Amino acid sequence: MERIEGASVGRCAASPYLRPLTLHYRQNGAQKSWDFMKTHDSVTVLLFNSSRRSLVLVKQFRPAVYAGEVERRFPGSLAAVDQDGPRELQPALPGSAGVTVELCAGLVDQPGLSLEEVACKEAWEECGYHLAPSDLRRVATYWSGVGLTGSRQTMFYTEVTDAQRSGPGGGLVEEGELIEVVHLPLEGAQAFADDPDIPKTLGVIFGVSWFLSQVAPNLDLQ
C-alpha cells in the first residue's frame, strides 16, 4: 500500500467524480461569484464487531492527501500543474504520507440504490461483512465540504460479529482499490481519536465519540 513511485501532478481535464463550476449570484444587492466542485453525495458506516470488541475501520492511500502533504512540506511543489503535461512531484515523500484511517465509505453514484443499500455494498466490498439494509441505524446526515463541494454525507451504524464476515474486504481490485481493514479495540478508541499524529478523517473522530457516548454505555462489555 505504501510503495508509491513516480508520483506526478497535472491538470484534471475530465473526471467522472467531480466538475469545477462557478456560481454567480447577487446577495443583498452585491454581485458575487463562488467556485465549487460538483461531486456525488456519500455514505459512511461505523461497524462495531462485538466478537472482537472493536470498531471496524479502513486504511488506504489517498492521492489528494499525499499531494497535499508534499505541498504543505515543500510549498510550491504543485505550481507546475499549469504546465502542458504532468510533472513529477519533487521531492517525493514516502507513501505513508498519504495513508489515512477512515470509516468504511462510498459514493452515492448508482441510480436506483437507497443510501442503506449503498452502505451495505461498501461494507461488503471494503470490510467483508454481509449486511442487510434493516441492520443499519442512521446516525446523522450532514453537509461536507461546504466551501468547496456542498455535498451531503450520511453515517450509519451497525453491530456485527465475526460470523458475518464472509469475505476478505479490501475493496474492488478492478477499480484500483487497495484497502486494509483495521480493528480498533474499544479500550484505546478514545486515545486513537484524540491522537493528532495518527492521520484520520473527521468521520472517525465523530464516529468514535458518538459510539462511546451513545452505544457503549448500553453494551455488556464484561
UniProtKB/Swiss-Prot annotation:
Residues 38-206 form the Nudix hydrolase domain. CDD domains: NUDIX_UGPPase_Nudt14. GO terms for biological process: nucleoside phosphate metabolic process; protein N-linked glycosylation via asparagine; ribose phosphate metabolic process. Its cofactor is Mg(2+). GO terms for molecular function: ADP-ribose diphosphatase activity; identical protein binding; metal ion binding; UDP-sugar diphosphatase activity. One of its GO terms (cellular component) is cytosol. The keyword Iron-sulfur does not apply. Its EC number is 3.6.1.45. It catalyses: UDP-sugar + H2O = UMP + alpha-D-aldose 1-phosphate. Optimum pH is 8.0-9.5. The keyword Phosphoprotein does not apply. It is found in: Cytoplasm. A motif (Nudix box) lies at residues 111-129. Belongs to the Nudix hydrolase family. Hydrolyzes UDP-glucose to glucose 1-phosphate and UMP and ADP-ribose to ribose 5-phosphate and AMP. The physiological substrate is probably UDP-glucose. Poor activity on other substrates such as ADP-glucose, CDP-glucose, GDP-glucose and GDP-mannose. This is Uridine diphosphate glucose pyrophosphatase NUDT14. The lineage of its organism: Eukaryota, Metazoa, Chordata, Craniata, Vertebrata.
